[in-house]
Amino acid sequence: MSEPASIALQKEIVRELEVAETFDAEREIERRVAFLAERLTSTGLRALVLGISGGVDSTTAGRLCQLAVERARAAGHEALFYAMRLPHGVQADEDDAQQALSFIRPDRVLTVDIKPASDAALDALLAADVAFRDPHHQDFVHGNIKARQRMIAQYAVAGAHGGLVVGTDHAAEAVSGFFTKFGDGAADVVPLTGLTKRRVRAVGDALGAPAALVRKVPTADLETLDPGKADEDALGVTYEEIDDFLEGKPVTEQVFETIVTRYRQTDHKRRLPIAP
């Protein structure tokens, strides 16, 4: 691909994912808190619901949610933030999740163990003679079941309390399609949209999030056979490289091709269902 064409493609992707040329953490906090509060007051809904894992994305989004419901209440609107713990059995980094909750100070904390439902779904598939290529393929599918089960639980809580489910998707995940379709990719509002990973961290820093959580190595941690696998190992590029691409900075040809290939392969994740 010629240099002008590659630059044009990079700019097109940056525009589609709404990554701004300039960034100010305090301004972004105000804009995103105002957005969430306005969605509550304008729709008459009474809750925000978000799963808290202990990573920087949910920690940052969680604090924005709590600030938003407090703002809505100050304006006379009834609203609560429900922070959900959604472990699959025992979570290895549960201490991080609890540290995140201590920082966020949510109105309500609900814990739902997704292991029984997720494992039962896999068992039912196996009982129906659904065949997988190998144990790793089965483990991957099971991981997606876990992600979708978490969203089922969050939507149930939102339905019970007249609320909105909050997603943690941001530009670095969107460009790589690094989320589960109809799992963590399903949400009603996505307050981190347009932020690169380093900008999410900057917002977390500005909010006062614990440094250990802000700098924590990101991991989806969905696969039992490969626990704690870092996002960057799965992606084949680092978040620094993805962020450079999204912020319009030069990257190596290999990084460019890796990002663009993933972007194209995962296009369906960012679209409405295909129709004739």
Curated annotation (Swiss-Prot):
Mg(2+) binds at D57, E173. GO terms for molecular function: ATP binding; glutaminase activity; metal ion binding; NAD+ synthase (glutamine-hydrolyzing) activity; NAD+ synthase activity. It catalyses: deamido-NAD(+) + NH4(+) + ATP = AMP + diphosphate + NAD(+) + H(+). Signal peptide: none annotated. It holds the Pfam family NAD_synthase. The keyword Nucleotide-binding applies. One of its GO terms (biological process) is NAD biosynthetic process. Its EC number is 6.3.1.5. InterPro entries: NAD/GMP_synthase (IPR022310), NAD_synthase (IPR003694), NH(3)-dep_NAD(+)_synth (IPR022926), Rossmann-like_a/b/a_fold (IPR014729). Gene3D superfamilies: HUPs. The keyword ATP-binding applies. Pathway: Cofactor biosynthesis; NAD(+) biosynthesis; NAD(+) from deamido-NAD(+) (ammonia route): step 1/1. Deamido-NAD(+) binds at R148, K181, D188, H268, K269. GO terms for cellular component: cytoplasm. ATP binds at G51, I52, S53, G54, G55, V56, D57, S58, T168, K197, T219. Catalyzes the ATP-dependent amidation of deamido-NAD to form NAD. Uses ammonia as a nitrogen source. Homodimer. Belongs to the NAD synthetase family. This is NH(3)-dependent NAD(+) synthetase. The lineage of its organism: Bacteria, Bacillati, Actinomycetota, Actinomycetes, Kitasatosporales.
